Amino acid sequence: MSVSRPARGADPGLSARPMSTFPLGPRRVRRSGYGAMQLAGPWAVNAPPDRVSAVGVLRAAVAAGIDHIDTAQYYGPDVVNDLIREALYPYPRELAIVSKVGVFRDVGQDARQLRQGIEDNLRSLQVDQLAAVNLRLPSPGRVDARFDDQLAAMVRARDEGLIAGVGLSNVSLEQLRHAADGTEIACVQNLFHLADRDSAPVLQECLRRGIAFVPFCPLGLPRGLANPVLTSPVVVRTAIRLGVTPPQVALQWLLQLAPNVLLIPGTGSTDHLLENLAAEHVTLDDQALRELAGVGA
C-alpha cells in the first residue's frame, strides 16, 4: 500500500495537502509516528525473531516520512535502541527519537537511576541529545516528594542539554498540572484508545496548554492479542462501510479527536506500518463518529 495514495473511504484531497504536524518540545513532527516496542516482541522482552526484517521496518518508517520514533532502553532490554542505531545511524536531522525512563519492569526509579537511564539511552542510540524523554510512572497517582525529585532530575537533564524536552507518562491530571505549572512539558504519553478513555481529562489539559498527547497502545493491544478495539463490531462494521481497515478507523478516530494527538502505533511488519500511516487519509463521517462514541462505554 502506498502511503501517498489514500485508502478507500479517504478524502482524495487530503493526499495533496501537507501532512498535519504538532509541536513536540522545540520541534514539530508529523502526527503519525512509530512506536518501536514490538520489535522486541509482544511484551518487549525478547530479541526480534527476524533482525533483518526489524531493521527493514525502521528504515521503511523513515523512508515513508515518519520523523517521530518512540523507544526505550528497557525494550528487550537492550534490544530496540540497538536496532534503531543499526538501521538509522547516522540519523536524519529531522528525526525525533523519544525515549522513557522511570520504570523498569514496574519498579519506580530514583533521581540517580533516572539520570543513568538517560545516559544509557544516549549511549545505545549514539546521540548527544534526545528530542524528549518521558518520566514513566508505575501508575497515575498523587503528587508527592518522590515525584518532585524525579521531575527535578528530568529538568536538570534538559538544562544540561541531554534532552530537548521533558515528557511524562502514565500520569494523573493532578501530576500533569503540578508538573506543567513548574516547568515546560513537551509531551504526555498515557494509555488511551477507543475502548479506554480514562485519560480524556489529561488529553484535554494537554490541549489547553499546547502539550502533545501521545496515546500508548492506540490500537488497544498488539496485533494477535484479543482486544476490545480491533474486534469491536462497531469498528469492524465502520471499516467495512468505509472500505478501510479496523486499525485505520481506530487511528483516524484519535487523529480527529484533538489536534495535539500524536500517534505511535507499533508493529514489526512493514505492511502494517504503511497501513497505519494510510490512516491519515481516512475520513470518518458523522455516522462513524456517532457510532464509535459508544465503543467501550
Regions found by a protein language model. Name each.
Residues 11-16, 138-297:
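Beta/alpha (TIM)-barrel catalytic core signal, keyed to glycine-rich beta->alpha loops juxtaposed to Asp/Glu
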